[in-house]
Structures are given as C-alpha cells and as structure tokens.
C-alpha cells in the first residue's frame, strides 16, 4: 500500500510570493485579505485588517469567534470548490476561495471585512460590544470606519480572489 504524503501550499509557493499577491489584492480592493493552509492556519499576515476587527480580536472571545468564522468560511469554500460569501459573527461580509492542486485542497484565500448595505444599528452594536467585554463607544467608532461596498464590488472582489486562487493553484501545480 502506497502512503500519500501531505502536500503543503508553503512547500510549493513561498510565503514571500503569497504575501506579495495578497498585498496586491488588498491594495487594489482596499479590503482585508489573508492566506491560510488546508487546516485554517494563517500562512501570511493578513493585510488591511480593519480597526474594528483589530478591536474585536483584542478580546479573547472576539479572537476565538473571528478564528472560527475564518475556518468555517475557508471550509465552506473548500467544500464547494468555489468562492463563497459569508457573514461573520460581527455582521461583516467576508469571502473565501479555495487553493487546490490536482484536486487536493492546500489552502484558502480569505478576504472582506466590509459592510454591504446598512451597518448594524446602535443597539445591536452596543450589545455585541458588551458580549465581547469591549468599550461600546470604541466599538461604535471602529464600526463607522468599516468600508461600505455594493454587492457588485464584493462580487467583483470575490471573483478576482477566485481567479488569484486559480493562478496560485497553477503555479503550485507546475512545481509539484
């Protein structure tokens, strides 16, 4: 019986190249992004992380919820083998696209941290801040800085992200 070795994205495409591609995406879309391996472990430092998300992640509960949302979004993208949208625990829109090589899922490209439509109302935001043991006013101030985008913008960004994921897959496949 032949044992199959675990293939890792980082073995096929170096972290600097992944970071450069991620940063180009962030610069173009002004959205947050990050690349994780097949287990949901970040390979790159996320770029364009909003002040709102940094505030939430400063809370232990918030950080755990954010990590869970990222893993669930990446898993959904990997399961569907396509770019997917999802609403995070804080009400922001995120998206994820799988990175595959020869039908093996090696990671995902996640992005977003934006609002489509109306932001949560003040009462909901204050309640969320209290659940995370965060200062409600700081939470509201940070929430006001979150980019508000149209559905078309988020669709375009997700499609571009998926195209980038396919390019990463091609690069990795050529090195495999």
Predicted regions and their residues:
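Structured interaction and signal-relay segments at domain junctions
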Residues: 2-91
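Short coil/turn segments at secondary-structure junctions
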Residues: 5-9, 145-148, 152
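Signal-transducing alpha-helical linker
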Residues: 10, 17, 153-156, 160-176
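Residue-level signal for secondary-structure boundary elements
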Residues: 30-33, 64-67, 151, 169, ...
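Alpha-helix initiation and N-capping motif
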Residues: 49, 70-71, 122, 136-139
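Sensory/regulatory domains in signal-transduction proteins
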Residues: 68-130, 145, 152-156, 160, ...
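Active-site gating loops and adjacent loop-to-helix segments of metal-dependent hydrolytic enzymes
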Residues: 130-136
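Regulatory/sensor and coupling segments of signal-transduction and defense proteins
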Residues: 138-149, 166, 173-176
């Amino acid at each position: 019986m032949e044992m199959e070795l675990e293939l890792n994205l980082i073995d096929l495409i170096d972290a600097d190249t992944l970071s450069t591609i991620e940063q180009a995406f962030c610069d173009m879309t002004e959205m947050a992004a990050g690349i994780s391996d097949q287990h949901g472990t970040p390979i790159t430092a996320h770029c364009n992380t909003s002040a709102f998300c940094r505030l939430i992640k400063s809370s232990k509960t918030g950080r755990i919820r954010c990590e869970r949302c990222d893993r669930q979004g990446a898993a959904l993208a990997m399961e569907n083998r396509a770019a997917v949208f999802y609403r995070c625990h804080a009400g922001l829109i995120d998206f994820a696209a799988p990175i595959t090589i020869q039908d093996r899922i090696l990671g995902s490209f996640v992005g977003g941290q934006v609002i489509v439509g109306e932001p949560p109302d003040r009462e909901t935001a204050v309640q969320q801040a209290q659940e995370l043991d965060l200062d409600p006013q700081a939470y509201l101030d940070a929430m006001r800085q979150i980019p508000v985008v149209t559905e078309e913008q988020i669709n375009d960004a997700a499609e571009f992200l998926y195209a980038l994921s396919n390019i990463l897959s091609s690069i990795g496949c050529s090195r495999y």
